[in-house]
UniProtKB/Swiss-Prot annotation:
This is Acidic phospholipase A2 2. Keywords: Calcium, Disulfide bond, Hydrolase, Lipid degradation, Lipid metabolism, Metal-binding, Secreted. Disulfide bonds join C26-C115, C28-C44, C43-C95, C49-C122, C50-C88, C57-C81, C75-C86. Coiled coil: none annotated.
């Protein structure tokens, strides 16, 4: 669920997902359309695509099981849908961490007109 995703981002990327990514680029926070503005926004685009492939549960509400082992996130549990959501969140948290240096405040709260291009396929 979104609270677990927030905690995962904090654990992996060392920053708040709500503060840094809730309204960033064309894909972070709000649905999404257009071209990802940078690598951090692309993390959100890929995360949206990942959620779109999940079947059997609501990715934003599904409560999953994960642990932090030697700094790595390990998704667990027997429910394949919840585990898939966990893997989507894990990949995004790692992507945010790996692209912290590309984050640019100019993409925070950008006008929707900047996101009018046709979206690329997942």
């Amino acid at each position: 669920n979104l609270l677990q995703f927030e905690n995962m981002i904090r654990n992996v990327a060392g920053r708040s997902g709500i503060w840094w990514y809730s309204d960033y680029g064309c894909y972070c926070g709000k649905g999404g359309h257009g071209r990802p503005q940078d690598a951090s926004d692309r993390c959100c685009f890929v995360h949206d695509c990942c959620y779109g492939k999940v079947n059997g549960c609501n990715p934003k509400k599904a409560v999953y099981i994960y642990s932090l082992e030697n700094g790595d996130i390990v998704c667990g549990g027997d429910d394949p849908c919840r585990k898939e959501v966990c893997e989507c969140d894990k990949a995004a948290a790692i992507c945010f961490r790996d692209n912290k240096d590309t984050y640019d405040n100019k993409y925070w709260n950008i006008p929707s007109e900047n996101c009018q291009e046709e979206s690329e396929p997942c």
